[in-house]
């Protein structure tokens, strides 16, 4: 039986084995340079982002803009007010047509209170424009030996108008609080009654 001659020599077989090992385990030094540069753009982007200057926060603030808008649309603060204790007596018959009509349905106190609220509203305007200085300060009341009705109430008055009224009705500052309130309410009612019939002369 003849011996078969190998297809490759010993040296060729060694070269083939070395070549196969290089295919499965490539040499890092032989890797193309492009593989190491794959992540370079990302790193460059990160550095660029870090170098960008921060945007100033005070350029525009929605909360601040909203606050300024609300302040501009808000009504002005209301004037400071003080409570004033008022008192007045019902008018004599035929002094006020309004009172004479109301007293047919309500008590004298209730009727006068309803008129006094309106009279004080009007008198505040008179204090503001100065027309109260030439207005009547009193009106006729019933002549009776019995104790007449005294209506008492209170009202919040603007401080500025209250100072004007006090300087007029109590220039010396000696009146008590209730005495001043009685003069103020009486003057307000007198002005209201006078406007019902301007020709009336008490």
Swiss-Prot record:
Residues 36-56 have a biased composition (Basic and acidic residues). Residues 24-56 are annotated as: Disordered. InterPro entries: Ribbon_hlx_hlx, VirC2, VirC2_C_sf. The keyword Phosphoprotein does not apply. Keywords: Crown gall tumor, Plasmid. It comes from the Bacteria. One of its GO terms (biological process) is regulation of DNA-templated transcription. The keyword Phosphoprotein does not apply. The Ti plasmid contains at least six transcriptional units, designated vir loci, which are essential for efficient crown-gall tumorigenesis. This is Protein virC2. It comes from Rhizobium radiobacter (Agrobacterium tumefaciens).
């Amino acid at each position: 039986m003849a011996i078969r001659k190998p297809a490759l020599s010993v040296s060729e077989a060694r070269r083939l084995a070395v070549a196969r090992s290089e295919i499965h385990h490539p040499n890092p030094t032989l890797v193309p340079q492009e593989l190491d540069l794959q992540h370079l753009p990302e790193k460059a982007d990160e550095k660029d982002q870090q170098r960008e200057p921060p945007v100033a926060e005070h350029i525009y603030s929605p909360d601040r803009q909203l606050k300024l808008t609300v302040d501009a649309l808000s009504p002005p603060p209301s004037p400071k007010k003080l409570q004033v204790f008022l008192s007045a007596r019902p008018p004599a018959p035929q002094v006020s047509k309004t009172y004479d009509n109301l007293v047919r349905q309500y008590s004298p106190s209730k009727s006068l209170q309803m008129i006094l609220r309106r009279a004080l509203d009007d008198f505040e305007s008179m204090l503001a424009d100065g027309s109260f200085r030439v207005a009547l300060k009193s009106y006729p009341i019933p002549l009776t030996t019995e104790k007449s009705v005294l209506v008492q109430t209170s009202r919040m008055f603007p401080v500025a108008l209250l100072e004007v009224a006090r300087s007029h009705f109590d220039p010396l500052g000696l009146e008590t609080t209730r005495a001043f309130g009685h003069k103020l309410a009486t003057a307000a009612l007198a002005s209201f009654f006078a406007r019902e019939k301007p020709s009336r002369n008490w």
